[in-house]
């Protein structure tokens, strides 16, 4: 009796551990650095999405694990944007559009972060620089996927500059 039970449990364990498990598509965003984006923008214009974060920011980590890990988000960003992760506290020298930005000890961040957020530092901040190169548009705080979708599609589908965001927001239907 005991051998039969042991054999049964062994067979069940073998079946359980050898069963094919579905492979979950892993979302992947090709995060670029600013130098690469600068050179590629000369060849092909697209909006630039910059994820402004810090190493200590808890909500930045939530944005990575919930929003940026979503397959729809990753696919859309890959097709419609040049995506950059930017640590606001980097001490590296940043060159963007002919200007050099340095670490600012007074603000404890890089001046580039101050520029693209218009001095409104909050983390995370999603910054979109439209494809026409106009002023950076900063959206502070964590964005769940449904809110993120509306914002990136506003820029990615070319509605920015054509229709006020409030009007776009009223007619937008989420699909992610």
Model-assigned labels for residue ranges:
Residues 29-48, 77:
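A short beta-strand-turn-helix
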Residues 4-14:
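Sec-dependent N-terminal signal peptides
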Residues 71-74, 78-145, 149-158, 165:
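Thioredoxin-like thiol-disulfide oxidoreductase module
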Residues 161-176:
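Flexible coil segments in periplasmic/lumen-exposed cytochrome c-class electron-transfer proteins
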Residues 43-61, 83:
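Short active-site neighborhood of thiol/selenol oxidoreductases, capturing the structured segment around
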